[in-house]
């Protein structure tokens, strides 16, 4: 619950459904005694992959199952010959804080406290650990998702530049009904030290704890607790009178 709350706050409202994310997180900790592993406890030579969800969380026909998540890892290993030694989430967000939890739990590998991004983001390049700046880096991305009964189930493996592979994965999400699970961008753990949001998951959990603690008194107190913890301030408050939610082009 704390991870879902804190992820939603740090994600800036992005990163998918906190309810769905918490369900996957609960499944992960039920399967094994999953623990969050600090980056400095990981061998620098360990190959780490990123787990993410790509697409439009508000799409009506979206569907990704736990089996789809595990199939992504299977396809990745089949294509690259690499068995990941650790996994990180691509970002903090309502649902995305939990990316990689189930895979780590079922594979028995570390869930590393070093998300690619401390907040939610819309494009694959934004969560690429600066790898898109290296013209020599060739990535492999695998993605799976979509309902079989609707004829939308897809499985893809793409290799190439991060920019072009990200666009292909986004296109796959559209064909799958709006969302796919993804495994991508293998790097050594040493690379994460300067290129990831080290400690981002534990920060989300503590943010959620402080917010939850404040909510026991009032919503206002919950917000104030978060402001004090993160060093923020309240700029405005009031009711939301109107908003627009649009799913288009896999976003």
Regions found by a protein language model. Give the residues of each.
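Non-transmembrane, aqueous-exposed alpha-helical and coiled segments at domain scale
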Residues: 1-7, 19-250
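Extended, polar beta-sheet/loop recognition surfaces of beta-rich domains
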Residues: 13
